[in-house]
C-alpha cells in the first residue's frame, strides 16, 4: 500500500480554527434521547452554550497537499539485476509544510524497482531505498509520484558486486511500488536504455565482437570460396 496524500485530517483542520472562539472547561457530555447535556465545573458560564452542527466544512480537497518536494540522487551501492540488489541514497528537500508522510521510489526512465515510506520533516532529508532490477543502462533516479531527480546513477555489474551487494530478503523492504506492469512503451524505453548502456559502458566488447565478425567473414570467403563450376562438373 502506498500513501501519497495529505496527513492533515478534516478533524485537525477544524480544530485548527479553535483559536477563533472562546473555550470553556466542561465535563464529559451526557447524551440522552433528546438532549446533549454537560456541567460547567468552574461556574463561569452564566447563560448557556450554543452548539451549532453543520456540514459546511469542505472535505473535497483533503487529498491535496501544499507540501513541495525536491529530489536529488546522492549515491548508489550494489548492482543492477534481480540477484544482488542496490541501495539508492536520496536527498529529499521538504518545503511549505512541517511534516509529510509519503513514499520515495527508485526508478529509471522505464519503470520503478523499489520504494520506501518516508516521514519527511522540513528541510533536508536523507532517504535510503533498497530495490532490485534494472540493467546495465539503467540510471536510477529518486522519484516521488511523477517527479524525479534530474540526474541518475548507474549501479555496478552483478558479477563485480556479488559480495558487497544488497542481497536482501527482509520483509520490511518494498520491491514493488504498486505501478502497473511494464507495457509496450516501457519495453521500448528499457530496450533503448539497454542499447545505450552496452554502447557506453562496454564499447570495447562491442568493438571486439564487430572485429571478430569481419574477420570471420574474410576467413570464410578465403577458406571456402564459391565454386561457379560446381554445376558444370556434376551435370548429368
UniProtKB/Swiss-Prot annotation:
Quote a single Gene Ontology cellular component term: membrane
InterPro entries listed in its UniProt record: Gc_C_bunya, Hanta_Gc_N
What residues form the membrane-spanning segments?
Answer: 203-223
- Keyword Manganese listed? The answer is no
- Higher taxonomy: Viruses, Riboviria, Orthornavirae, Negarnaviricota, Polyploviricotina
What's this protein's name? Envelope glycoprotein
Name the keywords, alphabetized: Disulfide bond, Fusion of virus membrane with host endosomal membrane, Fusion of virus membrane with host membrane, Glycoprotein, Host endoplasmic reticulum, Host Golgi apparatus, Host membrane, Host-virus interaction, Membrane, Phosphoprotein, Repeat, Transmembrane, Transmembrane helix, Viral attachment to host cell, Viral penetration into host cytoplasm, Virion, Virus entry into host cell
> Which parts of the sequence lie on the Lumenal side of the lipid bilayer?
1-202
Source organism per UniProt: Puumala virus (strain Udmurtia/894CG/91)
> Which residues lie within the region annotated Binding to the ribonucleoprotein?
219-231, 219-236
Cytoplasmic topology ranges: 224-236
Amino acid at each position: 500500500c502506498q500513501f501519497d496524500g495529505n496527513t492533515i485530517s478534516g478533524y485537525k483542520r477544524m480544530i485548527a480554527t479553535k483559536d477563533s472562539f472562546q473555550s470553556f472547561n466542561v465535563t464529559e457530555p451526557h447524551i440522552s434521547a433528546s438532549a446533549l447535556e454537560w456541567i460547567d465545573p468552574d461556574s463561569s458560564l452564566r447563560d448557556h452554550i450554543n452548539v451549532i452542527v453543520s456540514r459546511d466544512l469542505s472535505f473535497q480537497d483533503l487529498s491535496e497537499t501544499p507540501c513541495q518536494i525536491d529530489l536529488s540522487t546522492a549515491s548508489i551501492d550494489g548492482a543492477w539485476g534481480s540477484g544482488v540488489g542496490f541501495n539508492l541514497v536520496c536527498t529529499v528537500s521538504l518545503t511549505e509544510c512541517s511534516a509529510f508522510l509519503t513514499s520515495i521510489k527508485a526508478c529509471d526512465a522505464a519503470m520503478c524497482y523499489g520504494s520506501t515510506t518516508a516521514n519527511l520533516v522540513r528541510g533536508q532529508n536523507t532517504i535510503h531505498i533498497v530495490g532490485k532490477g534494472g540493467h546495465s543502462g539503467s540510471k536510477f533516479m529518486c522519484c516521488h509520484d511523477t517527479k524525479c531527480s534530474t540526474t541518475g546513477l548507474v549501479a555496478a555489474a552483478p558479477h563485480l558486486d556479488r559480495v558487497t551487494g544488497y542481497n536482501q530478503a527482509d520483509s520490511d523492504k518494498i520491491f514493488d511500488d504498486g505501478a502497473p506492469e511494464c507495457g509496450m512503451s516501457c519495453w521500448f524505453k528499457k530496450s533503448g536504455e539497454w542499447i545505450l548502456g552496452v554502447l557506453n559502458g562496454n564499447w570495447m566488447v562491442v568493438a571486439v565482437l564487430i572485429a571478430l565478425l569481419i574477420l570471420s567473414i574474410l576467413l570464410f570467403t578465403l577458406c571456402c570460396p564459391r565454386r561457379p563450376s560446381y554445376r558444370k562438373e556434376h551435370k548429368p
